[in-house]
Amino acid sequence: MSEIELVFRSNMDEHMNKIKEKYPDIKFYSYSKLGNFNQCKRGYYYTYIDKKVQKPSVYTELGTAAHTTLEDLYDGKVDKLDKALFDNEFKKCELFGIDFPKSKYDIKGGYYKDISAFYNIYNHIEAKEGDKFISELGFILILNEKSALMGYIDLLILHNDNSCEIVDFKTSADFDKKKVVEAARQLILYSLAMEQLYGLKVNTVSWEMLKYVSVQVGNYKRKEGIRGREWVEKCSTQIKALMKKKNYDPGLIDMYVALAINNNSIDGLPDDIKSEIKVNTYRRFFDITEEAKKEFYEYTLSSIENINKMLNKREEEWICEVDNFFCINLCGFYPKHCNPILNLSNKI
């Protein structure tokens, strides 16, 4: 791979132009572009065709901050994660009214607690001798002479034998069975691109779910995918059992664990107990099968075909079909340009 020029944001246009010389009719798409089209055609029209200005998204602003701090860590700019950037962006969102969705639940408070836990417990992914961490590595996957997918990978771990691991950072909620199929398409894309463009063997693909943790307490059963905001409470039974096994006084056990739950931290526990509690960000692996690859190609090619069929359609034919909760709380064009409640689109 050392003999191959790597693609980053700084030279992506250059690589795209080289491909255009070979395939003059080729068009480039991103994974998010296809997802945008399939989620809401009206949103796609406003984003990529009419190019209306969107209002900022709290999840985009804060997610970008978390990604940036991880990028700095793996680029070697810092030795440990710095939460200051995230906190600054959180305060900016409050100041400028970039709000979380309205709900009877405390979405804002829960999000902040989950991400705070991530910053408190995050451990740098272990590296073997000779491993290289590459952040925001660009790629172009040529599908055919008219279509290609391009984008950037959060983190690639490159080994000496030209094999690699792919890691995608996620600040979203964990995936259910339906969502995991949709989310996995992105990992499949990364894997196929690394094989096609760089000739790498991809050993594993995974998500680091930043709002969730994995915990090993002593020799007890490992707990995976616990919300960061409540991980100590969810592991409290095991922690109490471990302390009991080490002959701690029952009254002290209750006091120690109650304090740990209140702080969502084990910093106040005795050293011999802390040493037997291993906590890290939840890393969820996905096994890429031939069936999954087939589904990826079918989804991708049909999405591109459907986009091209719509290109000459009038604005009103790009229909908004998502639910009202998404439109009101998550869409960047509501209510200035699109209001599903009134079933109208303001021509601005």
Residue ranges, per PLM feature:
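RecB-family 4Fe-4S metal-dependent nuclease core
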Residues: M1-I348
